[in-house]
Every structure is written in structure tokens, then in C-alpha cells.
């Protein structure tokens, strides 16, 4: 194992967050950059997203609602705060996408946990990041203030698992949610 990888692994196993960019809703603590502090404005948006999902709204509906209410996207909000991000500045600062909403709904960090080793690469020459199964991820509870309660997070994951797309006929196929693409792993709909 290479020195840099060994250091990253040791840090990750101690519970130090390995991510460079903190999740939307948090900012780095000025005294200790490894610690996250709740950003009240962005945290309210995160709570609203979880609340809308609990009420049965899907990611696209939530994104459209946020866009209609002129809520800044995470990258536009960070740019306004003067925080550098890897994303380019969006043309429309309120143009929410369903993928952004899904990414927020799937982040366990909002429950106050630090989650390390979410992805891996096969070797240092392989640049492709692969998702690590939940069993191989290192989850450290109560490392920072929670925005969402654990019970709410679990309920949202349950609600999202039970959602499915409507077909043209309005009926669900018996294979809905059971058949996945062999290439990309996405759910197939019929």
C-alpha cells in the first residue's frame, strides 16, 4: 500500500471526514476544519427537502417546487458565500435538478454521522470510482450536529424504496423494482 493511501485509510478509520467539500447544509468550522457546523439557511432547505419527501413528493417534484420558490442551488449558494466548489457556476442559480435532490436525500451525514470509504478504486492507476457496499463503509455516529433525525432519514429511505414510475397504462408491472440493468445497475421499468 502506498503512503498516501495508508494515511487516508488511518484517518478514515479514526472518524476524520475524508471529503474535501462539506455537504450542503454544513460549513467547515473555522478553528477545526475537520469539524462541520450547521449552516442555518442551507439546513432549512435540507429539512424542507426531507419534509417534502416524507409527504410523498418525488425528487423531480421537489426540484420543481424549489425552483418555483427561487431557492438557490447548492453550488450557487456556495458561490454566493465565497466558497470554492468543483462545479461551474450555473446559468440559472435556482435551477434545481432531481439528481441534486436525490444526492441530498441519500446522504447519511445529515443525521450527524461521518461516513468514510463510500467509494473505492481497484488500483492507483484506475481512476474509476466504484460505490462501496454499506457493509464496507465506515460510519461514525454523532461526529457533528444533525440536521435530520435518524428516524426521519430511515423513513425517507423506506418511502423512496417503495416509489415507482407509472406506466402509460397506469398499472405497475409485476417486475417493477425487481429487474435491474446488467450494465449500469439501474432499475428497469416496463
Task: Annotate each PLM feature.
Residues 3-190:
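Conserved catalytic breakage-reunion loop centered on the nucleophilic residue
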Amino acid at each position: 500500500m502506498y503512503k498516501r493511501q495508508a494515511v487516508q485509510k488511518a484517518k478514515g478509520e479514526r472518524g476524520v471526514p475524508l471529503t474535501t467539500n462539506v455537504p450542503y447544509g454544513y460549513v467547515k468550522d473555522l478553528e477545526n476544519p475537520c469539524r462541520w457546523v450547521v449552516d442555518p439557511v442551507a439546513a432549512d432547505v435540507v429539512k424542507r427537502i426531507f419534509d417534502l419527501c416524507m409527504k410523498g413528493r418525488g425528487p423531480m417534484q421537489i426540484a420543481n417546487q424549489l425552483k418555483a420558490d427561487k431557492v438557490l442551488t447548492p453550488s450557487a449558494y456556495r458561490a454566493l458565500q465565497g466558497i470554492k466548489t468543483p462545479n461551474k457556476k450555473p446559468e440559472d442559480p435556482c435551477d434545481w435538478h432531481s439528481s441534486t435532490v436525490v444526492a441530498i436525500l441519500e446522504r447519511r451525514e445529515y443525521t450527524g454521522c461521518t461516513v468514510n470509504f463510500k467509494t473505492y478504486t481497484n488500483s492507483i492507476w484506475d481512476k474509476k470510482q466504484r460505490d462501496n457496499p454499506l457493509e464496507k463503509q465506515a460510519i461514525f455516529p454523532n461526529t457533528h450536529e444533525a440536521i435530520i433525525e435518524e428516524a426521519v432519514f430511515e423513513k425517507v429511505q423506506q418511502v423512496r424504496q417503495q416509489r415507482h414510475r407509472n406506466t402509460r397504462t397506469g398499472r405497475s408491472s409485476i417486475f417493477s423494482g425487481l429487474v435491474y440493468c446488467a450494465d449500469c445497475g439501474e432499475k428497469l421499468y416496463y
